[in-house]
Amino acid sequence: MGILFAALLAMTNPHLATGQIHWGNLSKIGVVGTGSASYKVMTQSSHQSLVIKLMPNITAIDNCTKTEIMEYKRLLGTVLKPIREALNAITKNIKPIQSSTTSRRHKRFAGVVLAGAALGVATAAQITAGIALHQSMMNSQAIESLKASLETTNQAIEEIRQAGQEMVLAVQGVQDYINNELVPAMGQLSCEIVGQKLGLKLLRYYTEILSLFGPSLRDPVSAELSIQALSYALGGDINKILEKLGYSGSDLLAILESKGIKAKITYVDIESYFIVLSIAYPSLSEIKGVIVHRLESVSYNIGSQEWYTTVPRYVATQGYLISNFDDTPCAFTPEGTICSQNAIYPMSPLLQECFRGSTRSCARTLVLGSIGNRFILSKGNLIGNCASILCKCYTTGSIISQDPDKILTYIAADQCPVVEVGGVTIQVGSREYSDAVYLHEIDLGPPISLEKLDVGTNLWNAVTKLEKAKDLLDSSDLILENIKGVSVTNTGYILVGVGLIAVVGILIITCCCKKRRTDNKVSTMVLNPGLRPDLTGTSKSYVRSL
């Protein structure tokens, strides 16, 4: 039943079937969609420990490399000591909280507390990172066990399993070079050359370590490292590292492209020269029904002015709902849009009307200089503002002109198979749009200003008008106050006086009218004295009546 309803809905409303964005009307004002993708959000990460062993095992060539090793240790100390001091400043001021139950007087772990008075100044990010750092740190027994294991291994990648804990992966970026190149060549090379070769390799490795952890010297507690950045310190074989860490699945490529695998420094040992990292591997959760659309705008001309429609770069749709989309925490991959946090937030009703096809709700702004797209390829057709850019049919060599009553030109294969626009030659396909958009056919939206200077000027004008309106309101309030101050008696006297004047005026007008009527009758009798009726043979009573 639900499937049947959806099919009927799609047939009766085709725009609803393909989404709530009215691409047909938007294309008339130069807005086209350039792509759509699913929406995935990173959820809670799983953590695993990774150890970077900075000092290789040189037992086989120890006699030839003492000088180079001493210099290498000195260089490592310049990087490791500041990081160790910053980590200790946070971790030594974080204490576990223990609570006692009311029924049984035994203590149990309840959380951690930060000694803010001893720490002094710390940002919210540093405090949060410090708490997470404390929770992911190894205990002293695990550290000592790790040291013993690292001293005996001579492998580039070693899986170290500790009692009661998960596997720890230890990596040494120079060990393969020592095992596979220097040790076999000990019989052919002099001791001095072996030392020089190792010194150059260690110096290069130190440079990679410095470029990786150098930015962390400023704030090693909250600094995060991507797995791509770690690849050099891990010997360059990132695929082998990911395999050892157990990272696989269909989302691995998407997570790598979005740089979702992060590492944070949790421990630094300046005696044994190793760094412990906590690797966070997120899982992806696809939000069903949400589609992220990417938009582009093409400028159009109204007379001599060039405009473009102001719309967001990305929007999201889910059913009938259209929302804004913040692409800042997101990465766009072939598998979809991957965000580290929710990037959808509400859109104003007016802008939603714009996307649903009401072009009068779409704001527009002037194009400044040469900024803005003047052509774009959509559905194989070229949508161009040929009033602002030269459009030429490459096939015939003729110029494609745009009449003043047109705002955009749509070029397809039936008009010109190969088009040259803006110095670019494009082969277009069959027609998907009308040949042009006429100005009288479009209800354009209100003009707005986006430049800081224009916005400031418009704001100053608005403030000036508000000040003038305020002055007028103050004047009207003053007049109203004066009217309220007049007493009721004075008002009554004024009304009585006005009434008497009106009555006297009416009487004077009435008398004047009567006098004028009498004067008219007298003048009529004087002007016709000879007109007398013939009364011969008429009775006296009739004459008297006359």
Curated annotation (Swiss-Prot):
**A GO biological process held by the record:** fusion of virus membrane with host plasma membrane
List the ranges whose topology is Extracellular. 20-491
Q: Where is this site: Cleavage?
A: R108, F109
**InterPro entries recorded:** Fusion_F0_Paramyxovir
| UniProt-listed Pfam families | Fusion_gly
Kindly report every residue range on the membrane side named Cytoplasmic: 513-546
This entry carries the following GO cellular component terms, namely:
host cell plasma membrane; membrane; viral envelope; virion membrane
Q: What is its main location?
A: virion
Task: Tell me what this protein is called.
Answer: Fusion glycoprotein F0
| Organism of origin | Rinderpest virus (strain L) (RDV)
